């Protein structure tokens, strides 16, 4: 079964659009005591190299040669020249406690009309990506793609979420099958009562399975955007799981955490910004310096808010690497004085 929008948008785009599978950018995250230079030597890859067929041996080499607890490689498409972007996630020491919820064990499944629709949506999205049609509208608290064929299936999800919410919520919380949970996480985001499913999605955001977490966080980002615009809906989304994800060695965790937190910090809640400064300042600085501008921007935006820089200034300099790094240096220096 096809599992997720995530795999489609990354893998299919890489296969279709990258120029000869050539690496254009390598960005690291999670480095604390190990230097980038040392990590690059252990990685054995550099910009301009062809993407290897498998990452498992490279991840193992990183762990063995550097004595790290975890190493994860993720590739996404593409930099400004159409080449691949390779993210190298590091966890130097083993985590004392898992941030993830242990997988449930119920033998329960979604109706086939839901899984069939999800698979059809996936296929339509693949075609849309191949044509470069990736825009979507999240103004209603869920994604509606610009591509009509993809949107057709998303509109079916609205019907499923309205009439089969009980089974969707039960599968999301209890199914032993991660593919079932991932499908439920995506479809349940189309519920008309976003407040009702927020807790279900927050639980899924700490699922043991990466794809379930990704789909849940993607849904919560759209809901968070709606909640910001319509406070009368009284939708509350805890930032805690997403703050914790900023330490994850898994790129999709960090990517979606930045997406959600860039929305939750829009109004610059003082307590949230203090939490981010006290717990994840270093992670934000590291990600804000990524050479991949589009992926660095949310980290830079959040870091700037932590540092008290107006959004208009952040958006003005965020796409210029030298100016971005200069402002990051200024924020870091100011933080040391606090």
Question: Model regions: which residues?
Answer:
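Extracytoplasmic/secreted envelope proteins and their assembly/folding machinery
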Residues: 36, 40-43, 55-63, 165, ...
């Amino acid at each position: 079964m096809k599992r997720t929008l995530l795999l489609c948008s990354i893998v299919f785009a890489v296969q279709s659009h990258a120029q000869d599978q050539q690496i254009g950018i390598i960005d690291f995250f999670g480095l604390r005591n190990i230097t980038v230079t040392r990590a690059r030597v252990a990685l054995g890859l550099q910009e301009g190299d062809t993407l290897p067929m498998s990452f498992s041996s490279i991840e193992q080499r990183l762990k063995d040669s550097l004595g790290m607890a975890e190493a994860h490689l993720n590739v996404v498409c593409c930099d400004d020249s159409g080449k691949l972007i390779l993210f190298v996630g590091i966890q130097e020491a083993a985590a004392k406690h898992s941030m993830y919820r242990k997988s449930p064990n119920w033998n329960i499944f979604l109706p086939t009309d839901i899984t069939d629709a999800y698979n059809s949506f996936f296929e339509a999205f693949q075609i849309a990506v191949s044509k470069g049609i990736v825009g979507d509208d999240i103004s209603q608290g869920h994604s509606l793609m610009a591509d009509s064929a993809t949107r057709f299936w998303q509109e079916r999800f609205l019907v499923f979420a309205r009439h089969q919410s009980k089974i969707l919520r039960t599968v999301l919380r209890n199914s032993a099958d991660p593919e079932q949970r991932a499908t439920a996480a995506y479809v349940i985001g189309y519920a008309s009562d976003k407040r009702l499913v927020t807790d279900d999605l927050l639980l899924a955001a700490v699922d043991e399975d990466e794809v379930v977490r990704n789909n849940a966080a993607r849904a919560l980002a759209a809901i968070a955007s709606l909640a910001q615009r319509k406070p009368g809906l009284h939708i509350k989304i805890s930032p805690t799981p997403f703050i914790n994800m900023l330490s994850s060695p898994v790129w999709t965790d960090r990517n979606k955490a930045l997406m959600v937190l860039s929305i939750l910090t829009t109004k610059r809640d003082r307590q949230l910004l203090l939490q981010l400064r006290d717990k994840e300042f270093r992670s934000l600085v590291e990600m804000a310096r990524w050479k991949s501008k589009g992926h660095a921007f949310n980290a830079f935006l959040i870091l700037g808010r932590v540092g008290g820089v107006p959004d208009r200034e952040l958006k003005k300099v965020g796409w210029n690497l030298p100016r971005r790094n200069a402002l990051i240096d200024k924020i870091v220096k100011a933080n040391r004085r606090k």
